Amino acid sequence: MADHSWDKTVEEAVNVLESRQILRSLRPICMSRQNEEEIVKSRANGGDGYEVFDGLCQWDRTSVEVSVSIPTFQKWLHDEPSNGEEIFSGDALAECRKGRFKKLLLFSGNDYLGLSSHPTISNAAANAVKEYGMGPKGSALICGYTTYHRLLESSLAQLKKKEDCLVCPTGFAANMAAMVAIGSVASLLAASGKPLKNEKVAIFSDALNHASIIDGVRLAERQGNVEVFVYRHCDMYHLNSLLSNCKMKRKVVVTDSLFSMDGDFAPMEELSQLRKKYGFLLVIDDAHGTFVCGENGGGVAEEFNCEADVDLCVGTLSKAAGCHGGFIACSKKWKQLIQSRGRSFIFSTAIPVPMAAAAYAAVVVARKEIWRRKAIWERVKEFKELSGVDISSPIISLVVGNQEKALKASRYLLKSGFHVMAIRPPTVPPNSCRLRVTLSAAHTTEDVKKLITALSSCLDFDNTATHIPSFLFPKL
């Protein structure tokens, strides 16, 4: 392993912040004595006060069954520009009052476990609203951080097997904060205050990483703290070559764990091996893997048995948790650094208390209702067997080529009663337009069969790719 130690580096950076009196602290506000007693009780009984269920219930269907007004439906069919303004028009309201809607089965959301409509989670939010309203309005460092937020952080740290966790306003903000804070190490420890090249942080980023990672890395680069190296998507030979040729001591590798537009996994085992060889800091964005992958819902790192090799695990509460917000599971020192230098965390209002309460309930429910994880992977297996398409996750990317083909297929599915979006540039490279299908534990076997039948009428499974051809990768 390389001589450089990230544990020592982050400790030195935190010490510098403390010596300059700019190390920020989180002080949980206790909303009331009753709230404090409830939280202590919840900790004592492991959250046993939360009601859970043994199988799919009728209310689960609200997370996958939706409706759109006829005016919206018509504009959508013809791909007419819309800002949603038609909902305020008299005609649209009249249509709504008459109950004239187009019912659609949702196959494009990220509510993988169907928890957004779970009554236990809804009740947790509702009870918090009734008692506290939205809670104190301010950034977490000022007054927005409560015992609800702290309890949520503790539960997520336990899930991810990390020392601590920092809850952020969104997953996007979490990635931004993490990347900027990592870069700040260079300026904090630079001999002259402005880092020389060999004092900067070298960040190695997968070519298909999420926009929030890309923007965070770009901001850190703009601040003069990092140099960026982009490696070809999941290409460990290319990454190894870049790492071996880089003379900079402080190295970081950042990657999505489960890629949102392709549905493929990062090569976690190979990344772990390279980490042992080069001693880099490994950061993963587990937005689509948290609660979905792993025996306990711990995510992609748990699935591949390499949790100890992940230094920072970024996640979101707006997908499988069915709520809102983001988080960074990490060591206590990294949390101190990020909460002191991560601007998107520092200068954003904390998530409302009802959302923190709901998210904690979601952690409990996801842990206990194991059948939900089993159900979504059963749907993955069924889709694979019925379509013959080689897929490995609940995110199914059916690459059809140009924009016209993708839109035509999406319109056909819309007419057939399915909400499946055509993904186009700039979200994906030109000529790699696709239908992005996502599965949920709230879907049934019959839902999947009906979707496969509709898909078979608008595309040829035998000639449909599930990943981007290498020649379409963004140029380095």
From Swiss-Prot:
Which Gene3D superfamilies does the entry link to? Answer: Aspartate Aminotransferase, domain 1, Type I PLP-dependent aspartate aminotransferase-like (Major domain)
Signal peptide range in chain numbering: none
Positions that bind substrate: R24, H210, T427
Phenotype of null mutants: Light-dependent spontaneous cell death due to the absence of D-biotin. Strong accumulation of hydrogen peroxide H(2)O(2) and constitutive up-regulation of reactive oxygen species- (ROS)-responsive and defense genes. Reduction of both chloroplastic and nuclear biotinylated proteins. Accumulation of conjugated salicylic acid (SA).
Pfam families referenced in this protein's UniProt entry, alphabetically: Aminotran_1_2
EC number in record:
2.3.1.47
- How would you summarize the oligomeric state and partners of this protein? Monomer.
Role this protein plays: Catalyzes the decarboxylative condensation of pimeloyl-[acyl-carrier protein] and L-alanine to produce 8-amino-7-oxononanoate (AON), [acyl-carrier protein], and carbon dioxide. Required for the biosynthesis of D-biotin that prevents light-mediated cell death and modulates defense gene expression, probably by avoiding hydrogen peroxide H(2)O(2) accumulation.
Q: What is this protein called?
A: 8-amino-7-oxononanoate synthase
Primary gene name: BIOF
